[in-house]
């Protein structure tokens, strides 16, 4: 991981286990990036600018996103994005927030928020498909407890924080599309 990215995350990450096997490790930013409040519909993380670097993910072995796309073993950056309100994503989730997963080796500037198209292009390098790798996320109301929980029939979520902002992130699950 490039020092400019690693220096911004919390020292203690989170390990997601399946039994005793580590399937994912996550480190979120110590302080959340800030910007003008986003007033678009169905956005929960309104104070974090689109395309901002929010954390690091490491997959020690092959994993997958909620769409079933394969994620190769490796280290990735996480950046916040919002799926476009063009009708292609109806029923995916009540909120439009998600983390775009991109190869850490190809992400160049932790301090620059990426526009939608360059961000999607960067993630396509990881997915090898026309669709970026994504992890669904939303702001949690109140303080909430940190840790893993079951959400509905198919999803396992992580309750954590980016800086002081409480979030819920789907770390395992499947969306039937």
What name fits each language-model region?
Residues 1-45, 101-177:
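Primarily secretory-pathway and cell-envelope proteins
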Residues 21, 50-54, 71-73, 94-96:
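Extracytoplasmic
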Residues 39-44, 53-62:
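N-terminal post-signal-peptidase region of extra-cytosolic proteins
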Residues 47, 88-91:
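Short consensus segments that form the blades of beta-propeller domains
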Residues 65:
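Short, acidic, Ser/Thr-enriched surface-loop or helix-capping motifs
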Residues 74-81:
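A short tyrosine-centered beta-strand micro-motif
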Residues 84:
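Short active-site loop/helix that positions an aromatic residue
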